[in-house]
Amino acid sequence: MVRGKTEMKRIENATSRQVTFSKRRNGLLKKAFELSVLCDAEVALVIFSPRSKLYEFSSSSIAATIERYQRRIKEIGNNHKRNDNSQQARDETSGLTKKIEQLEISKRKLLGEGIDACSIEELQQLENQLDRSLSRIRAKKYQLLREEIEKLKAEERNLVKENKDLKEKWLGMGTATIASSQSTLSSSEVNIDDNMEVETGLFIGPPETRQSKKFPPQN
């Protein structure tokens, strides 16, 4: 008798559902065992019944097989991540290469090279770009010139101030020297007047017989 094909949908009758579960569970466990023995495969099978009852089979250890599975999933994820990163790096490199090529073309055009195939609009754009570049260059040049002029003016002011300070210092030293010399000279004159003795003489009679009389100095 030919068995009819079972329709793949949930069995509504609870008793029939439990009977079908028991039959299929035993068949699945048997197939898992046969696969592990015949093919030397590491097999782990975990089944929860509709009533949450656990059934399991493992050719070695459920925990060891699950740990191996998790490691493998992690390795696959890392490989996918590396592949994604490699693809992203290749895309970025390709994009940068295209940008560099475009910049090289633009640079040659700005130098007047490779413009034979340019249209009037492209040439006008190049001219406008050069004008803007020249304006920025001139503005920067004038800014640097102004800064250099201000720097030189500041140095000049500092030199003038230093020269003035040195001149005032020199004049002050000269005045002090003259005053010191005058003070020393006056002191010497006073000492000379105090120590100097004057001799006076009175002569009576002929020159050959005259005698002198000395008078003591007056205080």
UniProtKB/Swiss-Prot annotation:
Segments carrying the region annotation (Disordered) are 77-96
Q: Which Gene Ontology CC terms are recorded?
A: nucleus
Provide the tissue specificity: Mostly expressed in the outer layers of the root meristem (lateral root cap and epidermis) and in the central cylinder cells of mature roots. Also present in rosette leaves and seedlings and, to a lesser extent, in cauline leaves and flowers. Enriched in apices including the shoot apical meristem and developing leaf primordia.
Question: What results from gene inactivation?
Answer: Decreased response to vernalization, the promotion of flowering by prolonged cold.
What are the residue boundaries of the MADS-box domain, all occurrences included? 1-61
Which superkingdom does the taxonomy of this entry point to?
Eukaryota
**What's a Gene Ontology MF term here?**
protein dimerization activity
CDD domains (UniProt xref) = MADS_MEF2_like
Gene Ontology BP terms:
flower development; positive regulation of transcription by RNA polymerase II; regulation of timing of transition from vegetative to reproductive phase; vernalization response
Q: What induces it?
A: Maintained at very low levels by the polycomb-group (PcG) proteins MSI1, CLF, and EMF2 via histone methylation (H3K27me3). Derepressed upon cold treatment (vernalization).
Q: Which residues form the K-box domain?
A: 86-176
Query: Where located?
Result: Nucleus
Keyword set, alphabetical order: Developmental protein, DNA-binding, Flowering, Nucleus, Transcription, Transcription regulation
A single Pfam family it belongs to is: SRF-TF
Chief localization: nucleus
Tell me the function of this protein.
Probable transcription factor that promotes flowering, especially in response to vernalization by short periods of cold, in an FLC-inpedendent manner.
Q: Subunit composition? A: Interacts with SOC1 and AGL21.
Protein name (record): Agamous-like MADS-box protein AGL19
Give the species.
Arabidopsis thaliana (Mouse-ear cress)
